[in-house]
């Protein structure tokens, strides 16, 4: 894997509050190696470890993007919905930002069927055919389309399982993470002090509650993906 410089600096991370963990009572002992101190009842994350693993994750996604691999970003907490969508769109990745439907990846054939249905309905609507149906039928299909757009809108162009999945919150997206583990899909995961660092392939210790912290981590990963994509396009 290529090692590159990703301009990850500790001061910027401190300003974004990346180092603030959860209360000391609410922690996972497996996170001990990633914690540097306790302050006012809160665990403080060791930012040199964060920088190291974030840099490793950037190297991984850069190499994967350079080889034309597919990415999926998962983050469904209300506060990260827009952030996840904009990061994914910028890096031309697929994303899930509303709700992870159980079996979305482990039962891929069902997801694929839903995606075909979604694409067909979108095509029908764009062509104006839904307006020629009886009102009741049209209303039912429009409701169906709206539901599919909500839950599958971010993966509408997905034609197969992703090569790498980036998960914004381990606790919130546990089902998605377990499905990736089951299928052997490599994962990159933000982990706060109440998480299990052993579940993902690359765990990035960071505050997963503060928007500024999540934005910083996602921005670094997205920049690395974009650089890798540019390299892929130049060589093909």
From Swiss-Prot:
Keyword match Chloroplast: yes
Domain of life where this protein originates: Eukaryota
Alphabetized UniProt keyword annotations: Chloroplast, Plastid, Ribonucleoprotein, Ribosomal protein
Keyword Ribosomal protein listed: yes
Molecular-function annotations in GO: structural constituent of ribosome
Listed Pfam families: Ribosomal_S2
Annotated Gene Ontology cellular component terms: chloroplast; mitochondrial small ribosomal subunit
Alphabetical list of InterPro entries matching this protein: Ribosomal_uS2, Ribosomal_uS2_bac/mit/plastid, Ribosomal_uS2_CS, Ribosomal_uS2_flav_dom_sf
Localisation per UniProt entry: Plastid, Chloroplast
Biological-process GO terms, alphabetical: translation
Family: Belongs to the universal ribosomal protein uS2 family.
UniProt cross-references to PANTHER family, sorted A to Z: 30S RIBOSOMAL PROTEIN S2 PROKARYOTIC AND ORGANELLAR, SMALL RIBOSOMAL SUBUNIT PROTEIN US2M
Protein name, as recorded: Small ribosomal subunit protein uS2c
Taxonomic source organism: Platanus occidentalis
